[in-house]
Amino acid sequence: MQPQLPIEVDAQTGVWTTDGLPMIYVPRHFFVNNHVETEAAVGREVYAPALYKAGHRSAYFWCQQEAATHGLAGMAVYEHYLKRLSQRGWGLFSFVAADPVTGHAQVQVDHSVFVLAQGIAGVPVDRSKVCCLFAGWFSGAMDWVLETAGSALRTTSAESQCAAEDGAHHHTHCVFTVSPL
């Protein structure tokens, strides 16, 4: 299978774009090793909230741009977001459930980059919830949907299960739960 994303490369600058947004193409182990070492240096209690805020802001911006680029609205933008994340190698993202009126959603992530990279190229094995980078993405997208529908409701998102977790019940995928603040 070939990539499903349109990729343009500027001949003058070498900048890659998809749907008009600049992209960076890096090996998975490079990104995950940088992520893991940053978390180790500053601690998850500091790093996770910073990732959440940045991810929320980026997802909101992405939804705004993609809605304009493709003429999409509402949950179609959020669905397109999950499709594009899946096409970019982060994992396979799908809704278990979603309600744009109440701000509730559950997003399933199969084959998360953070789970698959463990034990490869120096990435340590961690049997906890390791996919926290995604959390802000899902509330950012839902908040965009809510705001553009005229709702004042805002959401939060958290990883409720991770395929990396070790314990009585091994999970084959990760789940993120989006709920109103």
Give short role names for the model-derived ranges.
Residues 138-141:
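Mixed-charge, glycine-accented linear interaction segment located at domain edges/termini
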Residues 1-132, 150-157, 162-175, 180-181:
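N-terminal accessory segment detector
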Residues 145:
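Active-site or metal-binding loop neighborhoods of secreted/extracellular toxin and effector enzymes
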